[in-house]
Swiss-Prot record:
Record EC number: 2.7.7.6
Source organism of the structure: Psathyrostachys fragilis
GO biological process: DNA-templated transcription
Domain notes: The N-terminal domain is essential for RNAP assembly and basal transcription, whereas the C-terminal domain is involved in interaction with transcriptional regulators and with upstream promoter elements.
Protein name, UniProt field: DNA-directed RNA polymerase subunit alpha
Ranges where the record places region Alpha N-terminal domain (alpha-NTD): 1-233
Swiss-Prot/TrEMBL catalytic activity: RNA(n) + a ribonucleoside 5'-triphosphate = RNA(n+1) + diphosphate
An example Gene Ontology CC term for this record: DNA-directed RNA polymerase complex
Domain of life according to the entry: Eukaryota
Keyword Nucleotidyltransferase among UniProt keywords: yes
UniProt keyword annotations, A-Z: Chloroplast, DNA-directed RNA polymerase, Nucleotidyltransferase, Plastid, Transcription, Transferase
Lineage of source species: Eukaryota, Viridiplantae, Streptophyta, Embryophyta, Tracheophyta
Region (Alpha C-terminal domain (alpha-CTD)): 264-339
Quaternary structure (record): In plastids the minimal PEP RNA polymerase catalytic core is composed of four subunits: alpha, beta, beta', and beta''. When a (nuclear-encoded) sigma factor is associated with the core the holoenzyme is formed, which can initiate transcription.
């Protein structure tokens, strides 16, 4: 069981596998729960995980087969019950397990009469067959039968334009999707303000990996997808600071505040609260954390005081002086200061 603290909650977020079974060599099933989640979180997590499981998990497939002296994929080969197209479809169904990257070569070379199964494929050391009994072809006569194969690790559907290859090499529309199906359901429980949700997640795989392994890989892919956003604010701050360092404004912030004080003489500045200035939520929160609640509090601060506020940025400074000059003429404040 993995536990993770939930921000703003006294409970811990927990997940566990409540059911796991092997229905066949090519069908694994797993059922997981995640709880407690706040209202709406279960649907968010369920949708994201389902998409990641079905579309982002890598699988290994046979992507190409080469026959000798075969004019097209609809040809028949003497001494073989299946046509070339049927053999290609059987090769497409072979389930492989590996951690290889790039293209690898494999082959089949047998002598009939006999049945050819996945067990007859000669594979590189890093690849193994999940179900060795999967059928490929039936040799009805004592002939030599050889196929050169290409194996590749990828994700999703891989299709190629079909055309006759003079060298007898034919692409196979590979389906690199080890997760066969994903379902999720949500159960709500609790009363009043204590309501929370439980996410149930069901995963079926083709045997090349377990549902638990698939869930781990999908979660890791989602984390990698969101990692750049964790550094976006830091990178943006660095960019703004560098830009303003070399191109300072024509008038300093402190000079503008001094001019505002002179122009607004007689105005009860302690009666104007910063939430009346239409500041952005980010700038407003920075000022509130620094106990700046009124316009008088703000105008009493120097530029250096403001820049020492936690998370306060150069763009916040510019936004403040632009907002003050825009929204603080005498005639615009009469209604607000009439009390």
């Amino acid at each position: 069981m993995v536990r993770e603290e939930v921000a703003g909650s006294t409970q811990t977020l927990q997940w566990k596998c409540v059911e796991s079974r092997v229905d066949s060599k090519r069908l694994y099933y797993g059922r997981f729960i995640l709880s407690p989640l706040r209202k709406g979180q279960a649907d968010t997590v369920g949708i994201a995980l389902r998409r990641a499981l079905l579309g982002e998990i890598e699988g290994t497939c046979i992507t190409r087969a080469k026959f000798g002296x075969v004019p097209h994929e609809y040809s028949t080969i003497a001494g073989i019950e299946e046509s070339v197209q049927e053999i290609l479809l059987n090769l497409k169904e072979i389930v492989l397990r590996s951690n290889l990257y790039g293209v690898r070569d494999a082959s089949i070379c047998v002598k009939g009469p006999r049945y050819i199964t996945a067990q007859d494929i000669i594979l590189p050391p890093s690849v193994e067959i999940v179900d060795t009994a999967q059928p490929i072809a039936n040799l009805t006569e004592p002939i030599d039968f050889c196929i050169d194969l290409q194996i590749k690790r990828d994700r999703g559907y891989q299709t190629e334009l079909r055309k006759n290859y003079q060298d007898g090499s034919y692409p196979i529309d590979a389906v690199s999707m080890p997760v066969r199906n994903v379902n999720y359901s949500i159960f709500s429980c609790g009363n009043g303000n204590e309501k929370h949700e439980i996410l149930f997640l069901e995963i079926w795989t083709n045997g090349s990996l377990t549902p638990k392994e698939a869930l781990y890989e999908a979660s890791r892919n989602l984390i990698d997808l969101f990692l750049p956003f964790l550094h976006a604010e830091e990178e943006g701050t660095s960019f703004e600071e560098n830009k303003n360092r070399f191109t300072p404004p024509l008038f300093t912030f402190q000079k503008r505040l001094t001019n505002l004080k002179k122009n607004k003489k007689g105005i009860p500045l302690n009666c104007i609260f910063i939430d009346q200035l239409e500041l952005t939520s980010r700038t407003y929160n920075c000022l509130k954390r620094a106990n700046i609640h009124t316009l008088l509090d703000l105008l009493s601060k120097t530029e250096e005081d403001l820049m020492r506020i936690d998370s306060f940025r150069m763009e916040d400074r510019k936004h403040i002086w632009d907002t003050l000059e825009k929204h603080l003429p005498i005639d615009l404040l009469k209604n607000k200061l009439s009390f």
